[in-house]
Amino acid sequence: MKKIFLGLMISIGLALVSSLIVPNSYQSVNAEQGVQELSAKDFEQIKELYARYNQGSDFRDTELFLSAFADDAVMTREGGDIVGMDGLRADRARRYEGKTGDVGRRHINGSYLITPTPDGAEARTYYLLMDVTVRPPNVISSGYYEDKFVRTDAGWKIKHRTLYRDTLD
């Protein structure tokens, strides 16, 4: 019984020591590289950009969609790059074809992996695109985004989004 208790105490002690060492070493490595840690508020603000992008697209709300992006943002997907606010706005006009309101799709995101960088933050995030006009709703596309984020006077914004679609090839 004493051996079990001693083993338990050693394990708890090591866990406590490692919890103190790891964050400090992470901070010092980041500080040496000029990278600031992200706060919980930063994480939430970055995740909100996904909601702005998704709901702006799903409800054909151009201004909401554009509010996720920096003025000089680039979106890379099949077919090439869309550059800047004017390019993003023109792409939305082309896609919406003058229609407004619910498009009958829902973008769903998950597995957010957000990390600080010297210039802001980056993330890889999975997405599913669902058709909700049929019953049951079904997945019509899936993939992931690789994003670079910058902090602006208006808060966090997407600087560069690369969209990768899952394929069966």
Please report, for each region that a protein language model flagged, where it lies by residue.
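Positively charged n-region of N-terminal signal peptides that target proteins for export
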Residues: 1-4
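Bacterial N-terminal signal peptides
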Residues: 8-22
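Short beta-strand edge/turn micro-motifs at domain boundaries
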Residues: 26-28, 32, 122, 142-169
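Beta-strand elements of well-folded, non-transmembrane domains
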Residues: 127-133, 151
